[in-house]
Amino acid sequence: MNSIKFPVLDRTTKNSVISTTLNDLSNWSRLSSLWPLLYGTSCCFIEFASLIGSRFDFDRYGLVPRSSPRQADLILTAGTVTMKMAPSLVRLYEQMPEPKYVIAMGACTITGGMFSTDSYSTVRGVDKLIPVDVYLPGCPPKPEAVIDAITKLRKKIAREIYKDRIRPQQGNRCFTTNHKFFVVRSPHTGNYDQELLYAPSSTSEISTETFFKYKSPVSSNELVN
């Protein structure tokens, strides 16, 4: 049944009895029906959209795009991920049921791309937010490369043991860099204290000696000293 990696059909048995394990049966059913959640933010996602056409026909892999994270088991991130979008991406990943997989598509998603040099708001790699199963480099990668990444993910699922995958997630989830996001009050509320904004500056607290000291001209000798 599992035609990707291990043949689970025992040909020595009679009467065409199929013998397999529950783990292989689960892997075979999941690799043949991946439901991706498309998270496209930039030009790399246009290349993935080419797979929907009849030329590449990604339906043969059982891919059914979903619009809800609770119905998806694969999230494909394509494009630049900013600091403002990072909490939304993490929330979508957390809402996906287990087991779930991630494909990072494009240089901007993997390393930040050309925006990682002088941009203060770009995440330098989506693996700092969520764990990535398959990296797909390119700017942008071709549709054939996307098919190859999906094939590699199917091979990974075929030889996967479910208990080994959920065990690290039950412990401490630690990635390369922890981005700490805190919900703070917006500073632009429109309610400002008008008395503080338009209060005239008072010089009554400045002493007379200090006022005339800095008002008088300073000689060159005093500047050197």
Swiss-Prot record:
<keyword id="KW-0479">Metal-binding</keyword>
<dbReference type="GO" id="GO:0048038">
    <property type="term" value="F:quinone binding"/>
</dbReference>
<comment type="function">
    <text>NDH shuttles electrons from NAD(P)H:plastoquinone, via FMN and iron-sulfur (Fe-S) centers, to quinones in the photosynthetic chain and possibly in a chloroplast respiratory chain. The immediate electron acceptor for the enzyme in this species is believed to be plastoquinone. Couples the redox reaction to proton translocation, and thus conserves the redox energy in a proton gradient.</text>
</comment>
<keyword id="KW-0150">Chloroplast</keyword>
<keyword id="KW-1278">Translocase</keyword>
<feature type="binding site">
    <location>
        <position position="108"/>
    </location>
    <ligand>
        <name>[4Fe-4S] cluster</name>
    </ligand>
</feature>
<keyword id="KW-0874">Quinone</keyword>
<protein>
    <recommendedName>
        <fullName>NAD(P)H-quinone oxidoreductase subunit K, chloroplastic</fullName>
        <ecNumber>7.1.1.-</ecNumber>
    </recommendedName>
</protein>
<comment type="similarity">
    <text>Belongs to the complex I 20 kDa subunit family.</text>
</comment>
<dbReference type="GO" id="GO:0008137">
    <property type="term" value="F:NADH dehydrogenase (ubiquinone) activity"/>
</dbReference>
<keyword id="KW-0004">4Fe-4S</keyword>
<dbReference type="GO" id="GO:0045271">
    <property type="term" value="C:respiratory chain complex I"/>
</dbReference>
<keyword id="KW-0793">Thylakoid</keyword>
<keyword id="KW-0813">Transport</keyword>
<keyword id="KW-0618">Plastoquinone</keyword>
<dbReference type="GO" id="GO:0009535">
    <property type="term" value="C:chloroplast thylakoid membrane"/>
</dbReference>
<keyword id="KW-0411">Iron-sulfur</keyword>
<feature type="binding site">
    <location>
        <position position="43"/>
    </location>
    <ligand>
        <name>[4Fe-4S] cluster</name>
    </ligand>
</feature>
<keyword id="KW-0520">NAD</keyword>
<dbReference type="GO" id="GO:0005506">
    <property type="term" value="F:iron ion binding"/>
</dbReference>
<dbReference type="GO" id="GO:0051539">
    <property type="term" value="F:4 iron, 4 sulfur cluster binding"/>
</dbReference>
<dbReference type="InterPro" id="IPR006137">
    <property type="entry name" value="NADH_UbQ_OxRdtase-like_20kDa"/>
</dbReference>
<comment type="subunit">
    <text>NDH is composed of at least 16 different subunits, 5 of which are encoded in the nucleus.</text>
</comment>
<dbReference type="InterPro" id="IPR006138">
    <property type="entry name" value="NADH_UQ_OxRdtase_20Kd_su"/>
</dbReference>
<dbReference type="Pfam" id="PF01058">
    <property type="entry name" value="Oxidored_q6"/>
</dbReference>
<feature type="binding site">
    <location>
        <position position="139"/>
    </location>
    <ligand>
        <name>[4Fe-4S] cluster</name>
    </ligand>
</feature>
<dbReference type="GO" id="GO:0009060">
    <property type="term" value="P:aerobic respiration"/>
</dbReference>
<feature type="binding site">
    <location>
        <position position="44"/>
    </location>
    <ligand>
        <name>[4Fe-4S] cluster</name>
    </ligand>
</feature>
<keyword id="KW-0934">Plastid</keyword>
<keyword id="KW-0521">NADP</keyword>
<dbReference type="GO" id="GO:0015990">
    <property type="term" value="P:electron transport coupled proton transport"/>
</dbReference>
<dbReference type="GO" id="GO:0019684">
    <property type="term" value="P:photosynthesis, light reaction"/>
</dbReference>
<keyword id="KW-0408">Iron</keyword>
<keyword id="KW-0472">Membrane</keyword>
